[in-house]
Amino acid sequence: IDNWSVEKIKKAGGDAVKVLAWYRPDAEKKSLEYQQQYVQRIGEECEKYSIPFLLELLVYPFQDDDHHTKEYIEQKQKKSQHVIDSVKEFAKEKYKVDIFKLEAPVDSNDLEGDISKETEDAFKNLAKATNNKPWVVLSSGMGKTSFYKCLELAYQNGASGYLAGRTIWLDAFKNYPNIENVDKGLKTESVSY
């Protein structure tokens, strides 16, 4: 955001700095270096001003990938290793990340029905990649049943919680502009998380 900085956030009374970084470990070297320097610079500023740094990492699709979209929706057929390798990179001490906000390392379709060993292993490897830093999971707008399973696997592997949006509140907000029904939806369906 123009005219904002870690220093300004701290002086304004912020409790933490949250940054979203779109990353793809198999991207061009120049892009990777730019993204890494950007995150490192923010981490150094957070350390300087003694404010926690929460990094949200999302793997982006290349232009010619199947299911490419300009909207942020869960990337179908994402590769677990891309998610895991991205986390491994930013778990290095030089980035000074205090907590991660991470997407599931698998497609939400892999969270329906019986869970495969590959899916279980992907969550284990995601947890290892954090280098023992706290992490929370995001919903990527996946369905509620898949998100419950995602939370189950994340918690079994050491996740500290979740920071999720659409999966939890979207159904309630479909009642807008009827604020009474929005409120009711938030107090019933959304609370179960």
Residue locations for each model-derived region?
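Short, well-ordered beta-to-alpha junction loops that form the rim of enzyme active sites
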Residues: E56-L58
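Short, active-site-adjacent cap segments at secondary-structure transitions
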Residues: Y60-P61, W169
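Catalytic-face loop-and-helix region of soluble metabolic enzyme cores
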Residues: I99, E103-Y193
